[in-house]
Amino acid sequence: MSYGRDCRINSDYYLCCNDTRYNLEKLDSINDLGVIFDKNLKFDSHIDKKVNKAYSILGLINRNFRNMNFKSFVLIYKSMVRSHVEYANSVWSPYKIMDIEKIEKVQKRATKMINSIKNLTYENRLRM
């Protein structure tokens, strides 16, 4: 994978070791320290993966901790869900409205899981 103005580089990359030449395969995306970089430096696949991971953790929390108080839920949400979504966000900071809405939906669904504030509007649930 190459970064630059012209990503249509035709040269092959290789690694030489003990007089042996190993060709390196070209990739469309790479996972580095948990952040998925693609050849266009768009983080759509990374955001999709993190949002899906957050939903699966929310499902796990919902199945195992049905009648949880507000403070306990906030603690579990921040440690298990939000940490996944916000990891390295200074690198992949979402700038497209579509990506921001995907991430916001995770929090919206999480606030609906708390029985004591479930019936409030989303804005009021965030103020709690």
Language model features by range: what are they?
Residues M1, E101-M128:
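Short, charged alpha-helical motifs in flexible N/C-terminal segments and linkers
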Residues M1-D28:
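Short, conserved micro-motifs composed of acidic
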Residues D6, S56, S90, R109-K112:
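Charged/polar positions on well-ordered alpha helices
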Residues Y14-D19, I47-N52, R127-M128:
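Short intrinsically disordered coil segments
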Residues N23-V91:
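Basic, alpha-helical interaction scaffolds
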Residues F73, S93-K96, N119-L126:
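Structured alpha-helical bundle/scaffold domains in large eukaryotic membrane-trafficking regulators
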Residues E86-I100, E104, T111:
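Charged boundary/loop elements
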